[in-house]
Curated annotation (Swiss-Prot):
Subunit structure comment from the entry: NDH-1 is composed of 13 different subunits. Subunits NuoB, CD, E, F, and G constitute the peripheral sector of the complex.
Entry GO MF terms: NAD binding; NADH dehydrogenase (ubiquinone) activity; NADH:ubiquinone reductase (non-electrogenic) activity; quinone binding
Name of the protein this chain belongs to: NADH-quinone oxidoreductase subunit C/D
Keyword tags: Cell inner membrane, Cell membrane, Membrane, Multifunctional enzyme, NAD, Quinone, Translocase, Transport, Ubiquinone
Chemical reaction(s) catalysed: a quinone + NADH + 5 H(+)(in) = a quinol + NAD(+) + 4 H(+)(out)
Keyword Transport: yes
Protein family per UniProt: In the N-terminal section; belongs to the complex I 30 kDa subunit family. In the C-terminal section; belongs to the complex I 49 kDa subunit family.
Length: 593
């Protein structure tokens, strides 16, 4: 599928300084403090008094920064390596993305502990709503003018702000937990939905509205996810998504794990993405360390990542068709996923959560016979996809339930931070593997599937076509696998290559320290985004020169995708909501982290 794209996307330009010149011309060079990082984008500190004006300028400039890609905070109080930066107890960063420039810029603002407040930017980017709520939830930073500043990850009754450095990171640091009857009643009452708190009316002109909880254990919610629906009959007047039931504190865990030992935790973010979760993390760490991996490592990583793109999309396809009424295909897609997992397990030793990528390489070399397994799979799957297209995707029931349902355009997608198939289904040709190649994707031939209606059916079809392109990429990996090592020869490669430990005592000591304590990364900041199974996934890492991350920010695609739901589904039927939820393709671990 192809579509005419109204937005021309130029070649990627890392550290694009054009926007810095524009900002200096508009506000003066004295308005900003530039920070040198390894993020691949300009990072500028601005005074709080000018923050909103600067952000509004970037939103309205020629070739605008239409997407607020991310917004979060950092507790700076224990950070020791801050030379040249404005004094700050806390900081908040705004990561902006321009499709038309194909470049990013990060704006930071410093805050003192006794004055933790900022103006809301929900009037500039609507998706700032959830991000500002999360910053308040995690750090206690207030956003003046926010329409509903409340807990989003933690329960309403929670005390404290978990991502502060003085907040305990382990259960053993808390008092023993007990649930009294009074506390149980308090928790139950706090979960009761109050329409007035969200600006909703209980009655219309001639009718009473019904409020319905869809979830948090509804099968069509695809996880612990609750949506409170305001209904007039079966028509959705309004709705409020409620997340956080699956929150496990992944970003807090990263502060207590070594750079190496956090890798298995990345697998559990999008738990259907496998090594796709490892990739942005290890790439970001390798930027910090200055590691350039061998070409063979790049090709192996791409091959395994595309295998997991296929397994994730197969699960989406089967469960989505089941959501709209066809029960049989899900059994076939699960069987077909098993064939892919057979290959994955033979190469990595694990199925869903291999935790197989390493800082500087992969866990081990490809096993004997891997090529035959991969060859058999790439020859078999295209015919299988043809069968799915004919038997399921051309089915009149699926088309009737999804064509024209939950449609949105490119402008709306960018305003809400939508990426991946949900963005490309609107006709926007933005795939990081093409627009900003990483790990050697520029060496592969493949197409970016597009659609143009932006509805539930198009989102489904884009993912099916993506599986065909993944097969093309895997086939090229098979035919062009380089010779060479599976780890970089670098002091911070972890675990280090073991051969030298058998010859030199110094390398044996280094090996022991890096495996037991973890590598010491240079003090700096790095960032890496990738085209994951559900959209753009990224890691923003802050190192203070130690064996653990000072701050790890995990930006996932499913989080903004769920925030977009009310703007898309108002005025539709409840049955259309089910079709819409399935077409998003999300898992709650990817939302809640």
């Amino acid at each position: 599928m192809t579509a005419d794209n109204a937005i021309f996307i130029p070649p990627y330009k890392a550290d694009d300084q054009d926007v810095v010149v524009e900002l200096n011309n508009r506000f003066g060079a004295d308005a900003f403090v530039a920070q040198e990082t390894r993020t691949g984008m300009p990072v500028l500190w601005v005074k709080r008094a000018q923050l909103k004006e600067v952000l509004s300028f970037l939103r309205g400039v020629a070739k605008p920064y239409s997407m607020l890609y991310d917004l979060h905070g950092v507790d700076e109080r224990l950070r020791t390596q801050r030379r040249g930066l404005p004094a700050a107890d806390f900081s908040v960063f705004y990561h902006l993305l321009s499709i038309e420039r194909n470049s990013d810029v990060m704006i930071k603002v410093s805050l003192s502990e006794g004055d933790l407040n900022l103006p809301t930017v929900t009037g500039i980017w609507p998706n700032a709503n959830w991000y500002e709520r999360e910053v308040w939830d995690m750090f206690g930073i207030d956003f003046a003018g926010h329409p509903h500043l409340s807990r989003i990850m933690m329960p309403p009754t929670w005390e404290g702000h978990p991502l502060r450095k003085d907040y305990p990171a382990r259960a053993t640091e808390f008092d023993p937990y007990s649930l009294t009857l009074a506390k149980q009643q308090l928790e139950e009452e706090s979960a009761r939905f109050n329409p007035e708190a969200w600006g909703m009316k209980r009655q219309g002109a001639n009718e009473d509205y019904m409020f319905l909880n869809l979830g948090p254990n509804h099968p069509s919610a695809h996880g612990a996810f609750r949506i409170v629906l305001q209904l007039d009959g079966e028509e959705i007047v309004d709705c409020v998504p409620d997340i956080g039931y699956h929150h496990r504190g992944a970003e807090k865990m990263a502060e207590r794990q070594s750079w190496h030992s956090f890798i298995p935790y990345t697998d559990r973010i999008d738990y259907l993405g496998g090594v796709m979760n490892n990739l942005p993390y290890v790439l970001a760490v390798e930027k910090l360390a200055g590691i350039k991996v061998p070409q063979k490592v790049d090709v192996i990583r791409i091959m395994l990542a595309e295998f997991f793109r296929i397994t994730s999309h197969l699960l989406f396809l089967g469960t989505y068709i089941q959501d709209v009424g066809a029960m049989t295909p899900v059994f076939f897609t699960f069987t077909d996923r098993q064939r892919a997992y057979t290959v994955i397990e033979a190469i990595t030793g694990f199925r869903l959560h291999p935790a197989w990528y390493r800082i500087g390489g992969v866990a081990h070399d490809l096993p004997r016979g891997w090529d035959k397994l991969v060859k058999d799979f790439v020859e078999w799957l295209p015919k299988r996809l043809d069968e799915y297209t004919k038997a399921a995707l051309q089915n009149s029931i699926l088309k009737g339930r999804t064509i024209g349902v939950a449609a949105y355009n490119t402008k709306e997608a960018l305003e809400w931070g939508t990426t991946g198939a949900g963005l490309r289904a609107t006709g926007c040709n933005f795939d990081l593997r093409k627009a900003r190649p990483y790990s050697g994707y520029e060496n592969f031939e493949f197409e970016v599937p597009l659609a143009h209606n932006g509805d539930a059916y198009d989102r489904c079809m884009v993912r099916v076509e993506e599986m065909r392109q993944s097969i093309r990429i895997i086939d090229q990996c098979l035919r062009n696998m380089p010779e060479g090592p599976y780890k970089a020869d670098h002091p911070l490669t972890t675990p280090p290559p073991k051969e030298r430990t058998l010859q030199h005592i110094e390398t044996l000591i280094t090996h022991f320290l890096q495996v037991s304590w973890g590598p010491v990364m240079p003090a700096n900041e790095s960032f890496q985004m990738i085209e994951a199974t559900k959209g753009i996934n990224s890691y923003y890492l802050t190192s203070d020169g130690g064996t653990m991350s000072y701050r790890t920010r995990i930006r996932t695609p499913s989080y903004p995708h769920l925030q977009q739901i009310p703007s898309v589904i108002k005025g539709s039927m409840v049955a259309d909501l089910i079709a819409y939820l399935g077409s998003i393709d999300f898992v709650m671990a990817d939302v809640d982290r």
